[in-house]
Amino acid sequence: MDKNTLVGFVLIGAVLIGFSIYNRPSQEEMERAQRYQDSIQTIALQEAAKQAEAAAQSTQALTLDSTSLFFGANQGTEQFTTLENNLVKVTFSNKGGRVVSATLKDYNNQQGEPLTLFNEEESALNFAFEGKNENILTEDLFFQPMNVTDSTITMRLQTIGAGYIDFAYRLLPESYLVNFDIRAVGMQNFFPAAQKTVNIDWSQLARQQEKGFDFEQRYTSLTYKPADDGSDYLSEMKDDKESFEEPMQWIAFKNQFFSSVLIANQNFDDVTLESKLQKEGSGYMKDYNAEMTTFFDPTGKEATQLQMYLGPNHFKTLLATNDLVINQDEDPELEDLVYLGWPIVRQINRWFTINLFDWLSGWGLNMGIVLLLMTIIVKIIVYPATRKSY
């Protein structure tokens, strides 16, 4: 190493040492920085302690507050009860007092098993009752099954006193319709005098039932029926969310060939609907959610009357179900869940295509095969006219 190089290294080293000494913080600055760091850690610890305390208090309020009117319903063991007729098997859980699955006996899935619309993990139904001093959220409370028969069950949410709320279900014979009444008994002092509604939060993942994802996606939609208008639906091809001022007669979580429909005798108000697309391969088409209110009488003199249709989008079946809907002030028009096209085409579809569909599906064929055969038959019928046009 020559002399110039050595001198260069020495100078560089001297500059670095001098720069580090010059920029070194003073003792006072280091103490101030340490105090700042300590204060940051103290604040973080205090905040964490507050959050832990709040969580503990929340849990304690849920599980240990013996002053709650529903203290005894906070804990329990989940049990299931099944109602069935010749068409559908509906399973209920005492947790939340709700329907947790529906299986259609006359339809099979891709594995050849009875087709299930949804199960407990794929659906939720929560009722929120606003009280004077506490609110009731039914989804996490345990009900007591009462009056169980082959076609009826009453889920009772018992207070620590004599009052209770009943969810009374009745599966109608030879039908996909479940009548659902809600009634409060002996709870006038729990609710505010002005309380006239109950909040409902309903959600469901729409299963992929057919092999063709894109085609099924296109005909899977969250459909709704305003009380004074025809039915409509959210977008089938993108995420969509809408809020409505007008009352709704029913809301349907519709798949291509099957639907879960919630119908209100006293209509739904303050409705917000949301539909989210699901990815191919997930096993689901869409994630549905509906938030709304409906009539509720805290005195128990009048029941909240709901109905659930859990079945196929079969035109004649839906048409017959219209007559079983309690609210007949307006035509329920459940058959609109089957899209028949524009007015002229609609008549052809109603009187020819639907009968052809019923005949083919009566052979127990997969829906995809039924549609393929229908396409071939229709093309054969229109072939002579099509050939002449060329």
Describe the role of every protein-language-model region.
Residues 73-333:
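Soluble non-transmembrane domains of integral membrane proteins
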Residues 163, 299, 377-390:
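Membrane-interface amphipathic helices and adjacent TM-edge segments
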Residues 13, 375-378:
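Hydrophobic core segments of alpha-helical transmembrane domains in multi-pass membrane transport
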Residues 311-367:
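Interfacial loop/helix-cap signal at membrane boundaries in integral membrane proteins
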Residues 1-50:
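Subset of Sec-pathway N-terminal targeting signals
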Residues 45-64:
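Intrinsically disordered, low-complexity linker and terminal tail regions
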Residues 2-3, 113, 150-153, 165-170, ...:
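Selective transmembrane helix interface/packing segments
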